[in-house]
UniProtKB/Swiss-Prot annotation:
Keyword Membrane: no
Family: Belongs to the RecF family.
Single GO term (MF): ATP binding
Top-level division of the source organism's lineage: Bacteria
Name the UniProt record assigns to this protein: DNA replication and repair protein RecF
One annotated GO biological process: double-strand break repair
UniProt subcellular location: Cytoplasm
GO cellular component terms, semicolon-separated: cytoplasm
Amino acid sequence: MFISEIQLKNYRNYEKLELSFEDKVNVIIGENAQGKTNLMEAIYVLAMAKSHRTSNDRELIRWDEDFGQIKGKLQKRNSSLSLELNISKKGKKAKLNQLEQQKLSQYIGVMNVVMFAPEDLNLVKGSPQVRRRFLDMELGQIAPVYLYELSQYQKVLTQRNHLLKKMQGNSKNEETMLDVFTLQLIEHGTKILQKRFEFLHLLQEWAAPIHRGISRGLEELEIVYKPSVDVSESMDLSKIKEVYYESFQSVKQREIFRGTTLIGPHRDDLQFFVNSKNVQVFGSQGQQRTTALSLKLAEIELIYSEVKEYPILLLDDVLSELDDYRQSHLLNTIQGKVQTFVTTTSVDGIEHETLKEAKTIHVTNGTVDCEIDRA
């Protein structure tokens, strides 16, 4: 699949923009704070209905405006689709072929993207929240039911946390309601857990050989899910629910005292092992970056295996963060099969066939100038 054109209105520092793209490589060049990352972000937001940079939608709207809009034309193997996302202070509304979608979960996954930005290099050594977000965003693209379960889980979690804070003063009168929320949380949480297990099993199948290739056969990558309760992938759903319920009973008083939910998928984590050593703790910066690169390249292949079309790859100021060898491995892997967007302050130092015949987009203070490099 590829995005053939985009239109922006009141998006970040863009008052109005209409732009067409090449189906292979598009290089967005500009100095810092000119709008190149905003353009890249707009493509991501059009696909995912949320930003990878902020959770505050108001930041996506141009200063002193009430709304922002992103439109795009998506070309798939057997169809051409128009996508539209309208952003206001009240929230977001999505349209697909001019038809408004009742739920964003119906819209997400139509256009698949893989974002690789400098902060993704922190996927290994960053906080558990970074890794959970990685799971949620990537799984949501290929499993709409996951997004539904996640949204329901988060609603119940908010209600349960509010009740726990209320119970800090007097817990006896609210225990029945707490049990109701606990059972609802377990119901949605176990389904989230199962989907994560399934996803990571597939990701492992793709990431391990990719990592082996980048490391020239010297390293074996293993991805391990670390749940906040003592459950495993081999357990059936009823057993997982049973373990969750027992765990919630054992931490009930601590949760009331702390006023928050202490276990569940929102507290889980991922660990990455290279040659049986925890990369987060014992890995070199090179191993951590190889692991992050392996995961991103695995995402591309995993999405293709699930939806039978390659996703759009967004490389936001990340090539300069990779050494020549990893940079070449990345560009060799995607060459000719994935529509790719690259942001950079300069193409100097990036010598690769992939960038030949790329469309070059120069961004200066929210305006663009385009050319196709046929050198």
